Swiss-Prot record:
UniProt entry tagged with the keyword Protein transport: no
UniProt protein name: Ribosomal RNA small subunit methyltransferase H
Keyword Transit peptide included in the entry's annotation: no
Assigned EC number: 2.1.1.199
Species of provenance: Methylibium petroleiphilum (strain ATCC BAA-1232 / LMG 22953 / PM1)
Binding site for S-adenosyl-L-methionine: G38, G39, H40, D58, Y86, D107, Q114
């Protein structure tokens, strides 16, 4: 998601490219699965007819409050927002009497309002409680997880989700501090501990970057949510419906790329070679990255990748 160029500023990444790819029928029913501060949603609404509809979803209650109260609230009758993870899309649609949609947009990752608010605990740039939950009403904070997990488990999380080669040393230091009666409870404490444990540093990158990323992904089950959300898209999209995903990390993009590719070709069951191939359900349409001007204006956009696919159902009998 990564909206913003500074504290509490919200510059939506790949805004026009994403919405242009998503909205192919102005009368359609669309879903913004990651509302954030509404950058994509507002542009989607501007492209819909009076008959069009937009369901927005966000697991962060602050995002829902932003859409429903205050000066920035959305009053358009074609718009509705739900507080939920986008992986729950099928149930949310069923509750509204909707079976199929014309498009789903997912803008993956943490947003600038989350990063820039020290109380949310996502960033090492300012001290705050080590929370990291995108939905503070659900689940376990990063501090609570680190207060109970063993060294091997912590190291695996930091290595697998942060691709941090000093994961074992960091985990060892975390557990040693906990056993000494000083568990890490703030972002500042975690950043200082990691800086001491990491022996070599990447130019231009804070040594705590990978550890913070790993814990955030783990605490919010982000990769599982993404996998479930993509499966939900396949279930809910109409033939011709669009799946538009913006990701900011190779772990996320790899999941999206693999999912689209795996459903973009007919598959022959080698155990039954004379049976008809399994249907091709998606067609890849585009892969885009921000241009130089956008990256210059918003450095957080530099790692973004936009992928677009269309549901086809080729090979399925009518």
């Amino acid at each position: 998601m990564n909206q913003g160029v500074g504290p509490w500023q919200h510059t939506t990444v790949l805004l026009h490219e994403a919405v242009d790819a998503l909205v192919h029928s102005p009368d359609g029913y669309y879903v913004d699965g990651t509302y954030g501060r509404g950058g994509h949603s507002r542009l989607i609404l501007s492209k819909l007819s009076a008959a069009g509809r937009l369901l927005a979803i966000d697991r962060d209650p602050d995002a829902v409050a932003h859409a429903t109260s205050g000066a920035a609230r959305v009053t358009d009758p074609r718009f509705h927002i739900e507080h939920a993870p986008y992986s729950e899309l099928p149930a949310l649609l069923a509750a509204r009497g909707v079976s199929r949609i014309d498009g789903l947009l997912l803008d993956i990752g943490v947003s600038s309002p989350q990063i820039d608010n020290p109380e949310r605990g996502f960033s090492f740039r300012a001290s705050g409680p080590l929370d990291m939950r995108m939905d503070p009403t659900r689940g376990e904070s990063a501090a609570d997880y680190l207060a109970r997990a063993d060294e091997r488990e912590i190291a695996a999380v930091i290595r697998d989700y942060g691709e941090e080669r000093f994961a074992t040393a960091i985990a060892r230091a975390l557990v040693a501090r906990r056993l000494a009666g000083r568990p890490v409870r703030t972002t500042e404490e975690l950043a200082e501990l990691v800086a001491q444990a990491v022996k070599t540093r990447e130019p231009g990158q804070n040594p705590a970057t990978r550890t913070f990323q790993a814990l955030r992904i783990f605490v919010n089950a982000e990769l599982t949510q993404l996998e479930q959300g993509l499966a939900a898209a396949l279930q809910c999209l109409k033939p011709g419906g669009r799946l538009v995903v913006i990701s900011f990390h190779s772990l996320e993009d790899r999941i999206v790329k693999t999912f689209i590719a795996s459903h973009s070709k007919a598959v022959v069951d080698r155990r039954a070679p004379f049976a008809p191939p399994a249907p091709m359900r998606l067609r890849a349409l585009a892969r885009l990255k921000p241009g130089a001007d956008e990256v210059a204006a918003n450095p957080r956009a530099r790692s973004a990748i936009l992928r677009v696919a269309e549901r086809t159902d080729v090979g399925i009998a009518a």
